[in-house]
Protein backbone atom coordinates (compact mmCIF):
# COMPACT_ATOMS: atom_id res chain seq x y z
CA UNK A 1 0.00 0.00 0.00
CA UNK A 2 1.48 3.36 -1.06
CA UNK A 3 0.79 6.62 0.78
CA UNK A 4 1.60 10.31 0.34
CA UNK A 5 1.17 13.06 2.94
CA UNK A 6 1.33 16.69 1.87
CA UNK A 7 0.42 20.20 2.93
CA UNK A 8 -0.68 23.05 0.69
CA UNK A 9 -2.01 26.58 0.86
CA UNK A 10 -5.57 27.18 -0.30
CA UNK A 11 -5.85 29.62 -3.20
CA UNK A 12 -8.90 31.17 -1.52
CA UNK A 13 -10.84 30.89 1.71
CA UNK A 14 -13.05 27.79 1.56
CA UNK A 15 -16.61 28.10 2.82
CA UNK A 16 -18.49 25.12 4.25
CA UNK A 17 -20.21 24.80 0.87
CA UNK A 18 -16.86 24.85 -0.98
CA UNK A 19 -15.50 22.16 1.34
CA UNK A 20 -18.62 20.04 0.91
CA UNK A 21 -18.30 20.20 -2.89
CA UNK A 22 -14.59 19.39 -2.72
CA UNK A 23 -15.25 16.38 -0.49
CA UNK A 24 -18.09 15.06 -2.63
CA UNK A 25 -15.95 15.13 -5.77
CA UNK A 26 -12.91 13.73 -3.95
CA UNK A 27 -14.90 10.86 -2.49
CA UNK A 28 -16.32 9.97 -5.91
CA UNK A 29 -12.83 9.96 -7.45
CA UNK A 30 -11.30 8.07 -4.53
CA UNK A 31 -13.98 5.38 -4.52
CA UNK A 32 -13.53 4.84 -8.26
CA UNK A 33 -9.73 4.58 -7.89
CA UNK A 34 -9.41 2.66 -4.61
CA UNK A 35 -8.02 5.63 -2.67
CA UNK A 36 -8.62 6.16 1.05
CA UNK A 37 -7.31 8.86 3.36
CA UNK A 38 -7.87 11.95 5.39
CA UNK A 39 -8.12 15.66 4.52
CA UNK A 40 -7.66 18.38 7.13
CA UNK A 41 -8.52 22.03 6.37
CA UNK A 42 -7.61 24.90 8.63
CA UNK A 43 -8.26 28.59 8.24
CA UNK A 44 -5.56 30.67 9.92
CA UNK A 45 -7.01 33.90 11.33
CA UNK A 46 -3.60 35.50 11.78
CA UNK A 47 -2.47 34.99 8.18
CA UNK A 48 -5.98 35.14 6.65
CA UNK A 49 -5.53 31.97 4.61
CA UNK A 50 -6.46 28.32 4.59
CA UNK A 51 -4.19 25.31 4.53
CA UNK A 52 -4.72 21.66 3.68
CA UNK A 53 -3.03 18.63 5.18
CA UNK A 54 -3.85 15.38 3.42
CA UNK A 55 -2.92 11.72 3.41
CA UNK A 56 -3.90 9.56 0.45
CA UNK A 57 -3.29 5.82 0.27
CA UNK A 58 -3.80 3.18 -2.39
CA UNK A 59 -1.92 1.26 -5.05
CA UNK A 60 1.16 2.93 -6.48
CA UNK A 61 -0.56 3.56 -9.83
CA UNK A 62 -3.65 5.03 -8.15
CA UNK A 63 -1.51 7.31 -5.95
CA UNK A 64 0.52 8.52 -8.95
CA UNK A 65 -2.62 9.25 -10.95
CA UNK A 66 -4.29 10.97 -8.00
CA UNK A 67 -1.15 13.00 -7.21
CA UNK A 68 -1.05 14.32 -10.80
CA UNK A 69 -4.64 15.47 -10.37
CA UNK A 70 -4.02 17.01 -6.93
CA UNK A 71 -0.81 18.81 -7.88
CA UNK A 72 -2.42 20.49 -10.90
CA UNK A 73 -5.56 21.60 -9.01
CA UNK A 74 -5.76 25.44 -9.04
CA UNK A 75 -7.65 25.51 -5.72
CA UNK A 76 -4.35 25.27 -3.86
CA UNK A 77 -0.64 25.94 -4.31
CA UNK A 78 2.72 25.58 -2.56
CA UNK A 79 2.36 21.82 -2.16
CA UNK A 80 4.96 20.26 0.12
CA UNK A 81 5.24 16.48 0.42
CA UNK A 82 5.87 15.73 4.10
CA UNK A 83 6.15 11.97 3.76
CA UNK A 84 5.56 9.19 1.29
CA UNK A 85 6.22 5.51 1.38
CA UNK A 86 4.78 2.05 1.67
CA UNK A 87 2.75 0.54 4.49
CA UNK A 88 1.59 -3.01 5.04
CA UNK A 89 -2.05 -2.02 5.45
CA UNK A 90 -4.31 0.98 4.97
CA UNK A 91 -4.31 3.46 7.84
CA UNK A 92 -7.73 4.93 6.97
CA UNK A 93 -9.42 1.94 5.37
CA UNK A 94 -12.98 2.99 6.15
CA UNK A 95 -12.72 6.49 4.68
CA UNK A 96 -12.89 7.27 0.95
CA UNK A 97 -11.84 10.66 2.32
CA UNK A 98 -12.17 11.46 5.99
CA UNK A 99 -12.34 15.17 6.74
CA UNK A 100 -11.73 17.60 9.59
CA UNK A 101 -12.20 21.37 9.51
CA UNK A 102 -9.83 22.28 12.31
CA UNK A 103 -9.93 25.32 14.57
CA UNK A 104 -7.59 26.68 17.24
CA UNK A 105 -9.20 24.61 20.03
CA UNK A 106 -8.50 21.37 18.17
CA UNK A 107 -4.89 22.27 17.51
CA UNK A 108 -4.18 23.00 21.16
CA UNK A 109 -4.72 19.27 21.79
CA UNK A 110 -2.23 18.03 19.19
CA UNK A 111 1.06 17.18 20.84
CA UNK A 112 3.98 18.95 19.18
CA UNK A 113 1.84 21.07 16.85
CA UNK A 114 3.35 24.31 15.63
CA UNK A 115 1.88 26.62 13.00
CA UNK A 116 3.11 25.67 9.52
CA UNK A 117 5.69 28.25 8.49
CA UNK A 118 5.99 29.84 11.94
CA UNK A 119 9.36 30.45 13.60
CA UNK A 120 8.58 27.58 16.01
CA UNK A 121 7.80 25.25 13.10
CA UNK A 122 11.12 25.99 11.36
CA UNK A 123 13.06 25.67 14.62
CA UNK A 124 11.55 22.21 15.12
CA UNK A 125 12.39 21.26 11.53
CA UNK A 126 16.02 22.36 12.06
CA UNK A 127 16.30 20.45 15.34
CA UNK A 128 14.32 17.29 14.60
CA UNK A 129 13.53 17.12 10.90
CA UNK A 130 9.96 17.27 9.64
CA UNK A 131 7.24 16.58 12.20
CA UNK A 132 5.75 13.10 12.35
CA UNK A 133 2.95 13.69 9.86
CA UNK A 134 1.46 10.24 10.34
CA UNK A 135 0.94 10.66 14.07
CA UNK A 136 -0.51 14.14 13.55
CA UNK A 137 -3.02 12.82 11.03
CA UNK A 138 -3.83 9.90 13.29
CA UNK A 139 -4.65 12.41 16.06
CA UNK A 140 -7.23 14.05 13.80
CA UNK A 141 -8.60 10.67 12.73
CA UNK A 142 -9.00 9.62 16.37
CA UNK A 143 -11.05 12.76 17.00
CA UNK A 144 -8.83 15.29 18.74
Residue ranges and their predicted role:
Residues 1-144:
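Charge-rich, low-complexity N-terminal segments
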Amino acid sequence: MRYTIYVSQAAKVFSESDLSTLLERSRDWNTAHGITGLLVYRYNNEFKRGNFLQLIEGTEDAIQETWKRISSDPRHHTLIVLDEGDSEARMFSDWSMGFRNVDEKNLANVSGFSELGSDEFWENVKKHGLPDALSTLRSFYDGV
